[in-house]
């Protein structure tokens, strides 16, 4: 894949820096697409939102299995938004910022993909675990391992690191010439299987089961806000973030056809990462007291887990949980 053919700035930027700036000498006054100005406007707002959310989750709120996942998801979103903001500014300035700082921009580009991949994996884990809590409530409340959320998050971060490294080394890095186009194609197939045949179906199936079970049972209504948070977050991700992964995979093979669409997909991904704190706020806030309650109260309500696992053995022996049929 010839580096000069790459037009998506997240993939293109390391290439342009490594191959020199000769191509941009006569293009100093090029017009910047409006999509990049929108990205530069949205990404810092989303970065601040997720930063505030992360601070509350880490220092002001009591943790439960669900908030552990949300904390890690917020970190992934912060990483993505920070990188896309810096890269979009560099693109708008015709790579003036990155001149002479090749490895810094490489790190930002890889971190962007890293945050994106992690977001997909974490949302799948959230959906699957919530589905299990509805299907097997007694196990969830009494026998679920105490540090399961933290362990799952650690494994998903490691998987994301592996996938991102493979994608960068085999398909993006122009410095490494020992890898053939077939190597990149093999990585594309692996990522496609992982994303579209493993994680996305798991997310969809578990979310569907969750919706069906909740609609059939009124006992879960008291914690409906948590389920709404999960479902809306997943829907927004599927609409705004998944197209970027599909286009990236197609882009490596058919750059001339899908290159221009990448700018739109990057904007959508930025919107997705910026939207999550808004979702938590509007779902958790009371309609009559919106903008009047403290953020801690709103977030606590949004993330309240009525089925939170119980650690005391006596409680588990005496608790009666209605089985979902």
From Swiss-Prot:
Extracellular topological domain: 1-36, 87-104, 173-185, 246-263
Coiled coil ranges: none
Subcellular location: Cell membrane
Keywords: Cell membrane, G-protein coupled receptor, Glycoprotein, Membrane, Proto-oncogene, Receptor, Transducer, Transmembrane, Transmembrane helix
Membrane topology of the entry: Multi-pass membrane protein
GO cellular component: plasma membrane
Cytoplasmic side: 62-65, 129-149, 207-224, 285-325
Keyword set includes Transit peptide: no
Principal location listed in the UniProt entry: membrane
Residues glycosylated per entry: 5, 16, 22
GO molecular function: angiotensin receptor activity; angiotensin type II receptor activity; G protein-coupled receptor activity; peptide binding
GO BP of this protein: adenylate cyclase-activating G protein-coupled receptor signaling pathway; angiotensin-mediated vasodilation involved in regulation of systemic arterial blood pressure; G protein-coupled receptor signaling pathway; phospholipase C-activating angiotensin-activated signaling pathway; positive regulation of canonical NF-kappaB signal transduction; regulation of inflammatory response
Sequence intervals crossing the membrane: 37-61, 66-86, 105-128, 150-172, 186-206, 225-245, 264-284
Disulfide bonds: none
Disease named in the record: The MAS oncogene has a weak focus-inducing activity in transfected NIH 3T3 cells.
UniProt cross-references to PANTHER family, sorted A to Z: MAS-RELATED G-PROTEIN COUPLED RECEPTOR (PTHR11334), PROTO-ONCOGENE MAS (PTHR11334:SF61)
Assembly with partners or alone: Interacts with AGTR1. Interacts with FLNA (via filamin repeat 21); increases PKA-mediated phosphorylation of FLNA.
Function: Receptor for angiotensin 1-7. Acts specifically as a functional antagonist of AGTR1 (angiotensin-2 type 1 receptor), although it up-regulates AGTR1 receptor levels. Positive regulation of AGTR1 levels occurs through activation of the G-proteins GNA11 and GNAQ, and stimulation of the protein kinase C signaling cascade. The antagonist effect on AGTR1 function is probably due to AGTR1 being physically altered by MAS1.
Sequence similarity: Belongs to the G-protein coupled receptor 1 family.
Protein name: Proto-oncogene Mas
């Amino acid at each position: 894949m010839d580096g000069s053919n790459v037009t998506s700035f997240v993939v293109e930027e390391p290439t342009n820096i490594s191959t020199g700036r000769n191509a941009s000498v006569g293009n100093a006054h090029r017009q910047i697409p409006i999509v990049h100005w929108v990205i530069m406007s949205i990404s810092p707002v989303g970065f601040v939102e997720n930063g505030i959310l992360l601070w509350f989750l880490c220092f002001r709120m009591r943790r439960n299995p669900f908030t552990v996942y949300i904390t890690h998801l917020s970190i992934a979103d912060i990483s993505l938004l920070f990188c896309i903001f810096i890269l979009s500014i560099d693109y708008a300035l015709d790579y003036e910022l990155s001149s002479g700082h090749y490895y810094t921009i490489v790190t930002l580009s890889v971190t962007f993909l890293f945050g994106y991949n992690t977001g997909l994996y974490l949302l799948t884990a959230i959906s699957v675990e919530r589905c299990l809590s509805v299907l097997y409530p007694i196990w969830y409340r009494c026998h679920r391992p105490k540090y399961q959320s933290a362990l799952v998050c650690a494994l998903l971060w490691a998987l994301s690191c592996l996938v991102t490294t493979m994608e960068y080394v085999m398909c993006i890095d122009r410095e490494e010439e020992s890898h053939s186009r077939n190597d990149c194609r093999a990585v594309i197939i692996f990522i496609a299987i992982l994303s579209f045949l493993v994680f996305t179906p798991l997310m969809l199936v578990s979310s569907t089961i969750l919706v069906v079970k909740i609609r059939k049972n009124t006992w879960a209504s008291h914690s409906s806000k948590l389920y709404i948070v999960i479902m809306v977050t997943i829907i927004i991700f599927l609409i705004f973030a998944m197209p970027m992964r599909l286009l990236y995979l197609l882009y490596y093979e058919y750059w001339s056809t899908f290159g221009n669409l990448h700018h739109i997909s990057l904007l959508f991904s930025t919107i997705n990462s910026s939207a999550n704190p808004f979702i938590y706020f509007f779902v958790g806030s009371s309609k009559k007291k919106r903008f009047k309650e403290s953020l801690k109260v709103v977030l606590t309500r949004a993330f309240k887990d009525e089925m939170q696992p119980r650690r005391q053995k006596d409680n588990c022996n005496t608790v009666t949980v209605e089985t979902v049929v």
